[in-house]
């Protein structure tokens, strides 16, 4: 029977530690970490994510603000809003909730965020720092996965890691973080032939494709560690991941559940990176 990797419990523990660090920072340096979340339009899923981030920021003791903007806002107007917070020393983290409306160029918006305040880790400068082995701001989901692997003492050096999904948000940065730990990494995608056969060689399998229960027991080798990034609903409307949990858990050594695995750690790492940005602001 697999060990269930409890991301929710780890997130709670890290959040408690963060509250203590924020209190000390406030007492010693008179600085409160500040996070602004910019929301364009009224996407229901995005609204849920934004509320969760706002709740986590307040719980951590941050100065938190959500800016709600009309879906019809122009690209230039949105950049002006971002620049306002780039210049505001009370805010150490700026997050623009994605996706954006079709008339707005996403990359242009990401480029407008000060890289020092880019707590999502999507700015090309932060991406470059990650690939050069000098990461500061790292996409939060891969960062959270690394914390889970560390918490459960998963050895990565010399191990074979396979990632399903090559997005800029999860797959690609995840590959680099694993390479930094001296794993041998294969990044797969929808055009990868014999996908199950490739995945079956993995000591560590990370799945991020957004297809409910896609990964079955034939994808995993005996004793593998499986990290499920997906959040979907099955035919009965119940939350599930990209991995068929009930089928796979009998074969692997460790696995993250959905919900309660990777998800809670993503928001926790966003808060941690905002705190770290506040610390770096002391150095100018």
Swiss-Prot record:
<dbReference type="InterPro" id="IPR020631">
    <property type="entry name" value="THF_DH/CycHdrlase_NAD-bd_dom"/>
</dbReference>
<keyword id="KW-0658">Purine biosynthesis</keyword>
<feature type="binding site">
    <location>
        <begin position="165"/>
        <end position="167"/>
    </location>
    <ligand>
        <name>NADP(+)</name>
    </ligand>
</feature>
<dbReference type="GO" id="GO:0005829">
    <property type="term" value="C:cytosol"/>
</dbReference>
<keyword id="KW-0521">NADP</keyword>
<feature type="binding site">
    <location>
        <position position="190"/>
    </location>
    <ligand>
        <name>NADP(+)</name>
    </ligand>
</feature>
<comment type="function">
    <text>Catalyzes the oxidation of 5,10-methylenetetrahydrofolate to 5,10-methenyltetrahydrofolate and then the hydrolysis of 5,10-methenyltetrahydrofolate to 10-formyltetrahydrofolate.</text>
</comment>
<feature type="binding site">
    <location>
        <position position="231"/>
    </location>
    <ligand>
        <name>NADP(+)</name>
    </ligand>
</feature>
<dbReference type="InterPro" id="IPR020630">
    <property type="entry name" value="THF_DH/CycHdrlase_cat_dom"/>
</dbReference>
<dbReference type="GO" id="GO:0004477">
    <property type="term" value="F:methenyltetrahydrofolate cyclohydrolase activity"/>
</dbReference>
<dbReference type="GO" id="GO:0006164">
    <property type="term" value="P:purine nucleotide biosynthetic process"/>
</dbReference>
<dbReference type="InterPro" id="IPR046346">
    <property type="entry name" value="Aminoacid_DH-like_N_sf"/>
</dbReference>
<keyword id="KW-0560">Oxidoreductase</keyword>
<dbReference type="GO" id="GO:0009086">
    <property type="term" value="P:methionine biosynthetic process"/>
</dbReference>
<dbReference type="InterPro" id="IPR036291">
    <property type="entry name" value="NAD(P)-bd_dom_sf"/>
</dbReference>
<keyword id="KW-0486">Methionine biosynthesis</keyword>
<keyword id="KW-0028">Amino-acid biosynthesis</keyword>
<keyword id="KW-0368">Histidine biosynthesis</keyword>
<dbReference type="Pfam" id="PF00763">
    <property type="entry name" value="THF_DHG_CYH"/>
</dbReference>
<dbReference type="InterPro" id="IPR000672">
    <property type="entry name" value="THF_DH/CycHdrlase"/>
</dbReference>
<comment type="similarity">
    <text>Belongs to the tetrahydrofolate dehydrogenase/cyclohydrolase family.</text>
</comment>
<dbReference type="Pfam" id="PF02882">
    <property type="entry name" value="THF_DHG_CYH_C"/>
</dbReference>
<dbReference type="InterPro" id="IPR020867">
    <property type="entry name" value="THF_DH/CycHdrlase_CS"/>
</dbReference>
<comment type="subunit">
    <text>Homodimer.</text>
</comment>
<dbReference type="GO" id="GO:0000105">
    <property type="term" value="P:L-histidine biosynthetic process"/>
</dbReference>
<comment type="pathway">
    <text>One-carbon metabolism; tetrahydrofolate interconversion.</text>
</comment>
<dbReference type="GO" id="GO:0004488">
    <property type="term" value="F:methylenetetrahydrofolate dehydrogenase (NADP+) activity"/>
</dbReference>
<dbReference type="GO" id="GO:0035999">
    <property type="term" value="P:tetrahydrofolate interconversion"/>
</dbReference>
<keyword id="KW-0378">Hydrolase</keyword>
<protein>
    <recommendedName>
        <fullName>Bifunctional protein FolD</fullName>
        <ecNumber>1.5.1.5</ecNumber>
        <ecNumber>3.5.4.9</ecNumber>
    </recommendedName>
</protein>
<keyword id="KW-0511">Multifunctional enzyme</keyword>
<keyword id="KW-0554">One-carbon metabolism</keyword>
């Amino acid at each position: 029977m697999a060990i269930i990797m409890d991301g929710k419990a780890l997130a709670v523990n890290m959040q408690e530690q963060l509250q203590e660090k924020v209190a000390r920072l406030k007492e010693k340096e008179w600085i409160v970490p500040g996070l602004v979340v910019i929301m364009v339009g009224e996407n229901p899923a995005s609204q849920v994510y934004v509320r969760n981030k706002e709740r986590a920021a307040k719980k951590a003791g941050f100065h938190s603000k959500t800016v709600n903007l009309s879906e019809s806002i122009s690209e230039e107007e949105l950049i002006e809003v971002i620049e306002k917070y780039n210049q505001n020393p009370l805010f150490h983290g700026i997050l623009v909730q994605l996706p954006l409306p079709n008339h707005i160029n996403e990359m242009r918006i990401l480029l407008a965020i000060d890289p020092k305040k880019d707590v999502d880790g999507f700015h090309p400068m932060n991406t470059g720092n990650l690939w050069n082995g000098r990461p500061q701001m790292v996409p939060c989901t891969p960062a959270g996965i690394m914390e889970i692997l560390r918490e459960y003492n998963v050895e990565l050096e010399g191990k074979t890691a396979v990632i399903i999904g090559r997005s800029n948000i999860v797959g690609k940065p995840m590959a680099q973080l694993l390479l930094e730990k001296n794993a041998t990494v294969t990044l797969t995608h929808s055009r990868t032939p014999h996908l199950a056969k490739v995945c079956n060689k993995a000591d560590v399998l990370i799945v991020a494709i957004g297809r409910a229960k896609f990964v079955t027991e034939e994808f995993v080798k005996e004793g593998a560690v499986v990290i499920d990034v997906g959040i979907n609903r099955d035919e009965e409307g119940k939350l599930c991941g990209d991995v068929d949990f009930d089928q796979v858990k009998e074969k692997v050594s460790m696995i993250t559940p959905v919900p309660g695995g990777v998800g809670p750690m993503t928001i926790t790492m966003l808060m941690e990176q905002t705190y770290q940005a506040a610390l770096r602001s002391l150095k100018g």
